[in-house]
Amino acid sequence: MTKKQIYNILIIAVLGLIGLYLFNKYKVAPKMDVVNLSVVDSTSKPFDIHSLKGKKTIVAFYASWCPDCIKELHVLNEIKNEKLNDVDVLAITDETIEKLNTFKNKKQFPFTFLKLTKSFNELKIFSIPTVYLLNTKGEVVYQKVGYINWKDESELLHLKTLMD
């Protein structure tokens, strides 16, 4: 093998590793114990996610400036009463309480809005929306970075089945 071929192979390997790193950082939801997150409600009072044990729960990490987050929350709002009536939705941000309340009051979504006491980066959430589904035992049964098409009937059925 020539030096040029070895050099090309090394460059391809390095680029592949960089690609894998970026994919894992931005497209794979970090493993986390969602029910033990430190969060506060819109009045800055601590909120215990454990209190939702026994209920199916969608935990959506969002930001008020994120178009895909807003789109996903809008879709969840549209289908909540008809198709997700037995599911609680937690909308969690790392923005200020003021921004949380402005967004909450503007959108009027029937979700529980919470603020992290840490930043997304501290939790290794590098891309939003990031969604976790919890079953009735409070266990994470699904996680995804990026927009979920909740209007797709087969996707919705699959995700609801996971929460059972």
PLM-predicted stretches and their roles:
Residues 55-57, 61-65, 127:
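Short pre-active-site segment immediately N-terminal to redox-active cysteine/selenocysteine motifs
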Residues 90, 101-137:
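Short, internal strand/loop/helix patches
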Residues 71, 78, 98-106:
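Short alpha-helix adjacent to the SAM-binding motif of class I
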Residues 61-78:
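Conserved redox-active cysteine motifs that mediate thiol-disulfide chemistry
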Residues 1-5:
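Positively charged n-region of N-terminal signal peptides that target proteins for export
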Residues 20-49:
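N-terminal "domain-start" segment that seeds a small globular fold
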Residues 8-21:
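Hydrophobic membrane-insertion alpha-helices, especially the h-region
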Residues 133-164:
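Thiol-/selenol-based redox modules, centered on thioredoxin-like
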